[in-house]
Structure formats: C-alpha cells, structure tokens
C-alpha cells in the first residue's frame, strides 16, 4: 500500500497542497523542511502522519516547505490562491478581544467575555475547516477556547446526530480530531433538524445553559471564548435555527463564509438591534471539495465506525450482554423509528419521552447512554457515549451490544434515534 508512490512536493510561500483521498486508500505524509500546517495544526518535522480514506485536507505554508507523500490520492493540486491571510487577520482581531478581557480590572473582567464566534454558510463552504484553524491558532497562542458543534448532519466532535461542545486545550490533531474526555454531548438522534425542530432548539438551549455555567466558574474559558460551527442549512427553517443559535449563545461575531450576499443582508437586518454583534463576510476557499449526498452518507457511516474502532482502527470493540430488565430504551418525539416515512413524520409532542419495546427492531441501531436518572431528565442530560445493538434474544431476554469501552453501562437509560450501523 505504501512505498512505490513516495514523492516530494515543494510548496512556495503562502501556497497549499490540496488533497482528497480515495474511499479505500490511506495516505502517509511528512514535513521534510520549512514549516507547514493542516487546519492550523503545525506539522512536526520528519514524522510520518497517516491519513485514513475519505479525508480531504490542505497542507499550507506561510514561508515555504517541502513535504513527502506516500500513497495514492483521489485528487491533489497546489494552489497559491488562498484566503489564509484574511483568516489570520480574523484570528488576530479575536486575539485583541481576548487580551482586552484579561487586561480589564477584576470586577469588570468577571462580566466580560472573550469572542463568541459563530460560523455560518452554505454546505461545502469550509465552515468546519475555518473553525479548526481559529481554534488551533488560539491554542497555539496560549488560549483554551471552547468548540461548539451544532451540525447534526456531519458532526465533528463525535458521531452524527449530536449537539456538542468541547474545551480545546491542545492542538486539534488533523487525523484524530477533537477530544472527547471533557465534551458535553446531547443526542438529537437525527441527521436532519427539520424532523424535530423543537427538540433541536431545546438541545441547543440546554448546551448553551451548561456552557454559561462553565464560563461563570472558569475565567480562562470565559476569556478564551468559543467558536461555533453550524449546518449548511441556511434557508427557511434552517435560517430560523441560525438566528436562534446566534441569540441563544449570545454571539459577538457572525462569520458568513462564501458569496452569500442575501444571507449577510438578512442577518444584518434581523440582528440590527442586537448590541455588540458584528456580521463579517469572508471568502470561501477555492479548495473546498463539493460532496454529494451519497458521499455525505458514507462519511456519516465512517464517523460512526471511527467512534467504535478509532480513526486508525486502534480501538478494541467489546461485545457485551445485558438483561432486558437492566436497561430502559426511550425515544424523544413522535416520529416513526423505522420505515421510509420517518423523515417526514411530525408528532404533536416533539419533546414526548416514549418507552420503546425491546425487540428485534433495535438490531443495528445506535443508542446513546444517557446520564439521566429518570426519563423526564433525558432531554436536559448529556450522554456518556454510544453502543450499537448486535442482537436481541427475545426468549432469553438479553441484548448483545458492542461498545468501545470494556466498562459496564454507566446508566440504565438508553436513547434511540434513527442512526444505524452494521457491526463489522
């Protein structure tokens, strides 16, 4: 797989090598000389980094670099046309705001906050990439910003169908991604917010409340601020959700990525009475790869597999069993769990908590492990992780499930959504 395709690529200053990997072929890459970065993560010298299939990324250099590549790519080319200077200028302005908070007097600093940046734009505009850059550059300068991920379709922190936040204390590795150990994760259970708009808004509000409590007790997090990534759902219901998120998280800066003149105009119009809020339009990188709906589905399946096996297949998946009587499975909202009409089902009570009958229909379903003690706490509680049901034995009343952890289930309450995964 590796070896015959080894080649060197020389990058001139302020240029980048854009790479799209094939569905089945990994790639190795290392920096030989100069300095280069991926999503703001500075590459170490002479260290091979293995990128799994399906990844798309760009190796950028400010002053020139030579890299070595081992493997076959689906698409690669060098470009000197990048928006990186503008992106770095944005980072520098955020730094000024952070320093302004820390240099304030103690009394005023307690009521001031660092930048709360929310990134919006159409699908495939580079929102997540910009978020990673801003986070990594902030960490490199000694800050510990919080990343908030509201994109249930292509979640970055953990599996799809989640609304989550994580404190970023170390550089975000371009392969391993975001840390999970301190993440606050709510399970929406769907990849399309339109199916249950009220539940989506409610979970966004719950996450904002939790972060408000965290920031009130942590001056470092408060000064470092947050970077919020959103969906590429920017019209009609999607636009209403953007406005809701901007107000709920009390954003101080809305970044619109791409040539979205109407979106910029509408946001400025609808938010003109909100104090201390700026709307900024940044150009989209021409290196952003367009992804089909089928490819997005493949990515979602890959993200679920990565949760259980690890991005580099370095995790052990444990098969365990539990009695029916030791767990309770619930779903949120009145939507049909199986069948082609599930995405269009509207319930009269979108926040209704329903006990699910344990039977064969749970096989291959991904369930969230809730920290809730009682069913009425499910929506307000974060989740500990996820399991996938491998088998349901009705006669023995036992469930067989797989988990990336060998530990027993930390809670008896499990949440069912629409996500499925076939255990390999």
From Swiss-Prot:
Which UniProt keywords are listed?
A: ATP-binding, mRNA processing, Nucleotide-binding, Nucleus
Indicate the principal place this protein occupies in or around the cell: nucleus
Superkingdom as given in the UniProt entry: Eukaryota
Quick check: keyword Nucleus in the entry?
yes
One MF term in the entry's GO annotations: polynucleotide 5'-hydroxyl-kinase activity
What GO terms fall under cellular component here?
A: mRNA cleavage factor complex
Residues given in the record as ATP binding sites: 16, 56, 124-129
Coiled-coil residue windows: none
Its subcellular locations are: Nucleus
**An individual GO BP term:** mRNA 3'-end processing
- Cite the HAMAP family for this sequence: Clp1 (MF_03035)
Instruction: Supply the PANTHER family for this chain.
Output: CLEAVAGE/POLYADENYLATION FACTOR IA SUBUNIT CLP1P, PROTEIN CLP1 HOMOLOG 5
Which family is this sequence assigned to?
Belongs to the Clp1 family. Clp1 subfamily.
How this chain assembles, per its entry, is: Forms a complex with cleavage and polyadenylation specificity factor (CPSF) subunits PCFS1, FIPS3 and CPSF30.
Question: Function of this protein?
Answer: Required for endonucleolytic cleavage during polyadenylation-dependent pre-mRNA 3'-end formation.
**Protein name stated in the entry:** Protein CLP1 homolog 5
Origin species, per record, is Arabidopsis thaliana
